[in-house]
């Protein structure tokens, strides 16, 4: 009798859990639908289109032509993104370190208030600001000429790779700093105080105590910045008029003027691969750090 009652109870438990599971699926369904329709489906279509010709046959011609026609643009994109990430990392570490270890309260409050402003400015507005600021007769050169720091004949345009690097850094530094400063603020203050009592200065505390513990947040911010810089179209379209340029501008050019989705998706495939490799390296480093911890 006891055995039969326990069997009946064990069979009744899943039936009681079914409504709860169904309710959970209903709550998650809108998010899953958005991911499938807005990310997974376009990704699958772009991958298929990159390897199929107009007749529907499988081919690698689109990838080969993309590398032959836009190889310089691919290298240019990788170079600009790499320099931008290095600049973003350096500035973000400096700002975050001062926010956490700074000894002047009013300067810390002022910096905390100022550095976040570019977060609320869209990329298209950022591109227009940079175009007006970095041009030959832009605000930067006019200020340098008026203050006597540069002759008017020496003014030059920064609407090239340098302008792209400065614009990307100006836009993404606040985002990375926000993540990194939060991670640094979560570090146990006793570690910092122990290092200071042992004679370490603030710079050494930053690079040997605080930054190693906050490094995962820095990597996350840089990877997300990489994705943002590889996907933005407005900034390279506004700042660079010739070649080479960013891959997003070439993809838009290929679709707008030629209707060639095959080569455009092949260029997008290279962006996917670059982002995936970067994310894979981050995951490997994270797993190795957790294994040795």
Regions found by a protein language model. Give the residues of each.
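Glycine-rich helix-loop "coupling/hinge" segments at transmembrane-helix boundaries
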Residues: 52-56, 233-261
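A short amphipathic helical element positioned immediately N-terminal to and/or at the very start
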Residues: 58-67
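Glycine/proline-centered hinge or cleavage motifs at structural transition points of membrane proteins
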Residues: 198-200, 212
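Short glycine/proline-centered loop/turn elements that form peptide/ligand docking sites
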Residues: 187-191, 290-291
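Short, Lys/Arg-rich, polar N-terminal cytosolic tail immediately upstream
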Residues: 1-20
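Membrane-water interface segments at the C-terminal ends of transmembrane alpha-helices
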Residues: 20-52, 69-153, 159-185, 213, ...
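Short cytosolic juxtamembrane segments of multi-pass membrane proteins
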Residues: 285-293
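Short alpha-helical segment that forms part of, or immediately flanks, the ligand-binding pocket
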Residues: 115, 192-193
């Amino acid at each position: 009798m006891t055995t039969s009652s326990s069997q009946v109870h064990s069979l009744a438990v899943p039936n009681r859990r079914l409504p709860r599971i169904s309710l959970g699926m209903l709550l998650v369904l809108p998010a899953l639908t958005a991911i499938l329709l807005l990310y997974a489906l376009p990704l699958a279509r772009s991958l298929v289109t990159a390897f199929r010709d107009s007749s529907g046959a499988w081919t690698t011609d689109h990838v080969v032509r993309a590398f032959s026609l836009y190889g310089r643009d691919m290298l240019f994109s990788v170079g600009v993104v790499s320099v931008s990430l290095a600049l973003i990392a350096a500035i973000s570490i400096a700002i975050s370190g001062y926010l956490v270890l700074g000894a002047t309260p009013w300067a810390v409050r002022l910096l905390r208030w100022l550095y976040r402003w570019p977060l609320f400015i869209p990329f298209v507005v950022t591109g227009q600001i940079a175009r007006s600021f970095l041009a030959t007769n832009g605000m930067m050169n006019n200020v340098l000429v008026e203050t006597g720091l540069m002759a008017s004949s020496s003014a030059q345009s920064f609407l090239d790779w340098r302008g792209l690097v400065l614009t990307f850094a100006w836009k993404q530094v606040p985002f990375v700093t926000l993540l990194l400063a939060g991670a640094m603020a979560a570090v146990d203050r006793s570690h910092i105080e122990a290092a200071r009592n042992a004679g370490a200065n603030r710079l050494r505390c930053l690079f040997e105590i605080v930054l190693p513990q906050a490094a995962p947040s820095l990597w996350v911010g840089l990877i997300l910045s990489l994705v943002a810089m590889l996907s933005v179209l407005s900034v390279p379209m506004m700042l660079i008029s010739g070649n080479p340029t960013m891959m997003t501008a070439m993809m838009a050019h290929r679709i707008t003027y030629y209707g060639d989705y095959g080569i455009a998706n092949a260029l997008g495939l290279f962006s996917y691969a670059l982002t995936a490799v970067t994310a894979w390296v981050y995951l490997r480093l994270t797993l190795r750090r957790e294994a040795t911890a």
